Amino acid sequence: MIKIPVYFMPGLAASSTIFERIQLPVTHFEMYFLEWQIPKKSETLTAYAKRMAEFVTHDNAVLVGVSFGGVLVQEMKKYLSVRKVIIISSVKTNLEIPLRMKIVKSTKAYKLVPTTLLQNIEVLNKFSFGSMIQQRLKLYEKYLSVRDKTYLEWAIEQMLLWDRTDADPTVIHIHGDADEVFPIKNIQNCIVVKGGTHIMILSKFRWINENLPKIILNETVKTT
């Protein structure tokens, strides 16, 4: 049996370790993991997507992107012959971006984001108060390992300035009804995961492991 190649793209600042709990049947699928590259000076999202597409070495592959990685794989699709594009905890157009992000975009307040904080998560962890904050910072420390200042500033800007207004009807969208970054009320035409937050690639991995193969193979999916 010819196995289906599935390429996974993590979210903003995340490494492919966020997919460590994802398992697809080895009889049907081969899993490949993409990593963020440092953008070139003044590189557009389109140019970056074209460069990232070179890491996909199979025709008719499946692209799976999380959050900003979901935006990227939609742009990469322009340069590849793909079987499917699946986005998780992401958006299909800038119309699905919440109002607070649009305000940040219009005021250009994103240029004031202290990316140095993301570069020094270990320091934040030392001075954090409360077990919940420390637990979340430990998660960030483990999974958000891409902390290059050039990359962080570029990625935040590209996410906020994404100019797509028409959704690609072939893109399959999986979204949690408790997503705090991209609220479900703004999302159209998606497979809803009950209780899924923005990090459901970790917290809802059992649902994803059960249903992602079905989605790829066009089988019926459980939506609760």
Predicted regions and their residues:
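Short beta-strand/loop motif that positions the catalytic acidic residue
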Residues: 173-175, 179
